[in-house]
Amino acid sequence: VDYILGEYLSHPDRTELHEAFSSFKDKRYRYVRCDQLLHDSETNEVYLSPWLKDKKDGHPEFYQRLTDLLKNCGIEPKELKCTRDYWARDYMPVQLSENEFLKYQYYPDYLMKSKNPEDAETRTECANVLRGMGISCRSTKLIIDGGNMVPCGPYVVMTDKVFTENGKEKGDEMFKAELESELGHPVIIIPWKMHGDFNARDTDKYGHSDGFVKWCGGNSILMGNHGDQYPEEAA
């Protein structure tokens, strides 16, 4: 028991566990692992959507430069199937450890609530892509955007847009506990605010934490200087 409990960052004491055992199925216990997430430098395969090389909607020159660079590094990139846009990070499962992937519900408002009906048509159904890939995933019913999950050591950094995407008030502690329970790691929430018209193409309506933070190892992170554009929010 001590060995199992030692795998978690926090847990009720043994007495509380025994007392609550009879109603265990009806309770949500938040056991959060303290081991590190799998980071980019520890992975060994790169998958790209073929949309990235599409001459009309993609960026074929960038695709060629990127794949050449990967091959020069001894990495043979692989292509995904059944994708509808090239932002694979946003809709593909998040890799939590060597053999653990989590598939989430990808229904971003910037696609599903856009006034342009073509935007919703670009939503990729992850289940279709996963067929034949040989990847075993567990699933969550929570609505998450892959671009809004940045692994930082044992933590996952997300903007507070994840609350509104799931119909919750920002700061809802019960929802945050559920989110951490599904991810199996503690979540750090950073604030985000949309500026401009939702339907304008140049408006940042995405709320992605990967545009704010990058883990550099240890206790170091690289952050964009948000105060350059919105000094009133950087106080």
What are the roles of these predicted feature ranges?
Residues 1-235:
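The feature marks the mature, well-folded catalytic cores of soluble enzymes
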